[in-house]
Amino acid sequence: MKSLLLMMTFFTRIPVTYPYDYDEKDFIKGVKFLPVIGLLIGILMYLPTLLAPYIHRPIIIVSIWALYFLITGGLHIDGLADTFDGIFSYRSKEEMLRIMKDSRIGAFGVLGILWLLILNLTLAYYTENMLLLLVPVVGRASAVFAASRTIYARSEGMGGAFIESCRTKEGVISIAFSLLLGSMVSIKGAIIPMGITFLGVAMLTKKISKILGGMTGDTIGATIEISQTLFMLSAYLLKSIII
């Protein structure tokens, strides 16, 4: 329970009390709970869909993502912006890492956020409500999976504790948890898009690690956001074209 509460304080803005002193061992134990945090976020995001009989779907979709950003505090989308600014600067590895640490947002960061919002709002409109519940689960499982396949790119920083705590075991547990939940919703509609997403995450992690020499807290945040969009896109394409 300590580890779960610790993860909630780190990765959400949900007002929970953590009455313990910080212990790195609790953090290490807690990384495997990140998909569980994703499920909690998903349940909260699902609540606006209960108003479907009374409110038009576009308003519900906007409410879902507004709630998502309130719950996460925009933490991961900030990482996406920093990652875009750094990588698309096409500078040296050291310069990219410096740019990503800069609190100011650049043109590529703004474009990244805009494209992500457009895609998320559009895809969510066509995504079944139960699959929307799984979106944050997939995102956080992807974070653990990505971290388990790389090293930390900086010499110090908050992201290092997370990445160094994720090993193959944690990656497998996170994926298995996601697939288990997905199987309860839809084998075709959830499991196949999850498989496509995790494959995409593996490729993305390899590419970023090659560019930066590893991953950072920002690129893990970017991975969460990109994987969520990829999951919805895969589900949409499978539903409309193949299945």
UniProtKB/Swiss-Prot annotation:
<feature type="transmembrane region" description="Helical">
    <location>
        <begin position="127"/>
        <end position="147"/>
    </location>
</feature>
<feature type="transmembrane region" description="Helical">
    <location>
        <begin position="59"/>
        <end position="79"/>
    </location>
</feature>
<keyword id="KW-1133">Transmembrane helix</keyword>
<feature type="transmembrane region" description="Helical">
    <location>
        <begin position="172"/>
        <end position="192"/>
    </location>
</feature>
<dbReference type="GO" id="GO:0051073">
    <property type="term" value="F:adenosylcobinamide-GDP ribazoletransferase activity"/>
</dbReference>
<keyword id="KW-0460">Magnesium</keyword>
<feature type="transmembrane region" description="Helical">
    <location>
        <begin position="105"/>
        <end position="125"/>
    </location>
</feature>
<keyword id="KW-0808">Transferase</keyword>
<feature type="transmembrane region" description="Helical">
    <location>
        <begin position="223"/>
        <end position="243"/>
    </location>
</feature>
<keyword id="KW-1003">Cell membrane</keyword>
<comment type="pathway">
    <text>Cofactor biosynthesis; adenosylcobalamin biosynthesis; adenosylcobalamin from cob(II)yrinate a,c-diamide: step 7/7.</text>
</comment>
<keyword id="KW-0472">Membrane</keyword>
<feature type="transmembrane region" description="Helical">
    <location>
        <begin position="33"/>
        <end position="53"/>
    </location>
</feature>
<dbReference type="GO" id="GO:0008818">
    <property type="term" value="F:cobalamin 5'-phosphate synthase activity"/>
</dbReference>
<dbReference type="GO" id="GO:0009236">
    <property type="term" value="P:cobalamin biosynthetic process"/>
</dbReference>
<dbReference type="GO" id="GO:0005886">
    <property type="term" value="C:plasma membrane"/>
</dbReference>
<keyword id="KW-0169">Cobalamin biosynthesis</keyword>
<protein>
    <recommendedName>
        <fullName>Adenosylcobinamide-GDP ribazoletransferase</fullName>
        <ecNumber>2.7.8.26</ecNumber>
    </recommendedName>
</protein>
<keyword id="KW-0812">Transmembrane</keyword>
<comment type="similarity">
    <text>Belongs to the CobS family.</text>
</comment>
<dbReference type="Pfam" id="PF02654">
    <property type="entry name" value="CobS"/>
</dbReference>
<comment type="function">
    <text>Joins adenosylcobinamide-GDP and alpha-ribazole to generate adenosylcobalamin (Ado-cobalamin). Also synthesizes adenosylcobalamin 5'-phosphate from adenosylcobinamide-GDP and alpha-ribazole 5'-phosphate.</text>
</comment>
<dbReference type="InterPro" id="IPR003805">
    <property type="entry name" value="CobS"/>
</dbReference>
